[in-house]
C-alpha cells in the first residue's frame, strides 16, 4: 500500500511550534485527529526531536483552518508519514532556535549545548532550565524574542507498506454461514511510533475488513439509485458478538524514507481481511466466490451451483 498520494496528487503539510513561558512546547497543525491517534503520535515525534517529556508537548486538538497551518487532510494513510516529516523538520528548527538563544544567554560557555528533558546541557552539566530560558525569551529587557518555528512543505516522497492476513474458518454449507475461528493480520509498517496504537489500528481495520467480507452491502433501488438499507439497523456492521479474537503482529523494518523510519498503517489493515476469508472458504469447500460480501444467500446459491447442496 502506497503511503500518501504523491506523485499522483499533492502532498503538503504545515506545523507551527512555540516555546511557552513555562518551558513546554505548543504544537499547532492542520492535520486532523479523527480517532486514529494522530495527535498522540505527533506529540511523541515532537518530544523525540526536542528530547522532552511528552507531557510537556501541548497540541491543539481541535483544528481551525482560520488559524492553523495548511494540511491536505486525513486520508491515504499519510499523516504519520507526510505530516510527520513536517513535524520533525519544525521541531528541529525550534531546537536550533532554542539552542541559538541559549548561546546568547551563555556567551562564556564553550561546550556544545543540547536539550535534555527540560534542561539546556553544556556537555554533561546543566546550564539553564528550559523554563528559565523561556522566561528570558519572553520578558528580558535586553533580549526578548519569543521562540517559535513554522514549517510548511510539499512532501515529494513516498514508500510502500506491506501486509498479509491469515484466516481459518468453519463453513456450514446447508445454512450458508461462516464462522471465523482464527484471524491474524501481519504488517510491515516500518518503525512503530506507538506500538499500542498500531495494534489498535490493525484491530479496527480488521473488523472493517471482516465486515466487507461477510455482511456489509449497500443495496440500491435499481430505478432511483437510492439506498434501501441506509440505516445501521439494515446495513449490517460487525458487532462484538460477530467478531472473533483478532490478532495483530508486525515486522518492524526501519524505512529510510519515513521521518522516523515509519510508513503507512491507516488503511492497510482493512484490505486483506475479506480476501483471506474468501480464500479460506475456497480451501474449505472448493467453491470460489468472486463477489463480496459472503452473505448466507450468496453462499447457498454458490454451493447449490457447485452441487454441494
Segments the model singles out, each with a brief description of its role:
Residues 32:
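Gly/Ser-rich, acidic/histidine-flanked active-site/gating loops
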Residues 20-22:
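Internal nucleotide-binding/catalytic subdomain
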Residues 24-29, 180-182:
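Short, aliphatic-rich beta-strand segments
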Residues 41:
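Flexible, small-/acidic-enriched active-site or ligand-binding loops
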Residues 1-18, 237-240:
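Accessory "access/gating" subregions that flank catalytic or transport cores
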Residues 44-309:
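C-terminal catalytic domains of large/alpha subunits in multi-subunit enzymes
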Amino acid at each position: 500500500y502506497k503511503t500518501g498520494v504523491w506523485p499522483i496528487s499533492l502532498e503538503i503539510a504545515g506545523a507551527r511550534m512555540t516555546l511557552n513561558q513555562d518551558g513546554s512546547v505548543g504544537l499547532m497543525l492542520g492535520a486532523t485527529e479523527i480517532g486514529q491517534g494522530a495527535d498522540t503520535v505527533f506529540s511523541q515525534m515532537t518530544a523525540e526531536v526536542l528530547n522532552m517529556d511528552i507531557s510537556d508537548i501541548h497540541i491543539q486538538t481541535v483544528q481551525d483552518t482560520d488559524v492553523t497551518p495548511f494540511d491536505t487532510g486525513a486520508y491515504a494513510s499519510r499523516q504519520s508519514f507526510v505530516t510527520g516529516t513536517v513535524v520533525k523538520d519544525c521541531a528541529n528548527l525550534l531546537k536550533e532556535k532554542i539552542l541559538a538563544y541559549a548561546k546568547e544567554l551563555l556567551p562564556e560557555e564553550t561546550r556544545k549545548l543540547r536539550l535534555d528533558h527540560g534542561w539546556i546541557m553544556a556537555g554533561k552539566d546543566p546550564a539553564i532550565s528550559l523554563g528559565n530560558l523561556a522566561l528570558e525569551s519572553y520578558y528580558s529587557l535586553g533580549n526578548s524574542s519569543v521562540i517559535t518555528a513554522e514549517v510548511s512543505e510539499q512532501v515529494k516522497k513516498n514508500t510502500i507498506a506491506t501486509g498479509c492476513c491469515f484466516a481459518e474458518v468453519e463453513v456450514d454449507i446447508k445454512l450458508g454461514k461462516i464462522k471465523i475461528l482464527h484471524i491474524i493480520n501481519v504488517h510491515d509498517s516500518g518503525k512503530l511510533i506507538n506500538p499500542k496504537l498500531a495494534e489498535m489500528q490493525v484491530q479496527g481495520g480488521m473488523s472493517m475488513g471482516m465486515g466487507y467480507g461477510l455482511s456489509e452491502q449497500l443495496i440500491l433501488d435499481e430505478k432511483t439509485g437510492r439506498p434501501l438499507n441506509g440505516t445501521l439497523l439494515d446495513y449490517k456492521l460487525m458487532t462484538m458478538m460477530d467478531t472473533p479474537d483478532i490478532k495483530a503482529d508486525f515486522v518492524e523494518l526501519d524505512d529510510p524514507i519515513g521521518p522516523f523510519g515509519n510508513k503507512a498503517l491507516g488503511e492497510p489493515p482493512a484490505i486483506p481481511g475479506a480476501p483471506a476469508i474468501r480464500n479460506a472458504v475456497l480451501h474449505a469447500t472448493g467453491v470460489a466466490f468472486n463477489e463480496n460480501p459472503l452473505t448466507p444467500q450468496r453462499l447457498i446459491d454458490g454451493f447449490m451451483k457447485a452441487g454441494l447442496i
